[in-house]
């Protein structure tokens, strides 16, 4: 209602939080740095936001949201499908050959499912790898993540206060 009023006091700021995927570095194949980099570089975050999330979010390139007290994180792993394929080949899986499989775990939510499906498709299209999706109810999901029973898990961090240190 306020948003539609002339001279409205309504103001909307970006969400002080980041949703991301946690990769378990203790189990293969995500124990390999090149695999982790390849997975990251094979994700078109801007396309994901524009299509799956209908432009309602800011693409995350860092755990710290942009403009958190003037902090602008660098885009360390931008979308780079060619480099992603090179890194996967360096890890021993050229064009996805010999890929041992991978499982992405997320908690029950239609948006989480849509994002997981989009990632699964991007990884298939760019890297030619298969990724299984596992949906878990909240308590089961928390137990899986707490006990490190996952390869990739959906995570999030919501800031307690507006300062980049809150995300470190």
Language-model regions, residue ranges each:
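Extracytoplasmic/secreted cell-surface and envelope-processing proteins
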Residues: 21, 31-32, 112-114, 143, ...
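Periplasmic binding protein-like
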Residues: 9, 122-168
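Conserved short loop/turn motifs at secondary-structure junctions
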Residues: 25-26, 104-110, 135-138
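Append "and occasionally in soluble cytosolic enzymes with long acidic Gly/Pro-rich linkers
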Residues: 10, 30-121, 125
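Residues at the C-termini of beta-strands that transition into short coil/loop
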Residues: 14-16, 67, 137, 156
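Extracellular/periplasmic solute-recognition and catalytic clefts
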Residues: 1-27, 50
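Extracellular/periplasmic catalytic domains that process cell-envelope and extracellular macromolecules
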Residues: 3, 14-16, 95-98, 146-148, ...
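Envelope-exposed proteins and targeting segments
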Residues: 17-19, 100, 127
């Amino acid at each position: 209602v306020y948003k539609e009023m002339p001279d409205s006091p309504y103001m909307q700021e970006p969400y002080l939080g980041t949703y991301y995927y946690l990769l378990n570095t203790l189990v293969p194949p995500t124990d390999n740095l090149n695999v982790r980099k390849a997975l990251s570089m094979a994700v078109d975050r801007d396309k994901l936001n524009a299509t799956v999330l209908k432009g309602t979010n800011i693409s995350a390139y860092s755990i710290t949201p942009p403009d958190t007290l003037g902090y602008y994180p660098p885009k360390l792993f931008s979308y780079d499908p060619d480099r992603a394929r090179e890194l996967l080949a360096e890890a021993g899986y050229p064009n996805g050959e010999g890929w041992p499989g991978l499982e992405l775990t997320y908690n029950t939510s239609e948006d989480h499912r849509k994002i997981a499906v989009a990632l699964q498709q991007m990884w298939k299209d760019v890297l030619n790898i298969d990724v299984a999706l596992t949906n878990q109810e909240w308590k089961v999901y928390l137990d899986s993540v707490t006990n490190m029973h996952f390869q990739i898990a959906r995570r999030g961090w919501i800031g307690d206060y507006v300062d980049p240190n809150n995300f470190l």
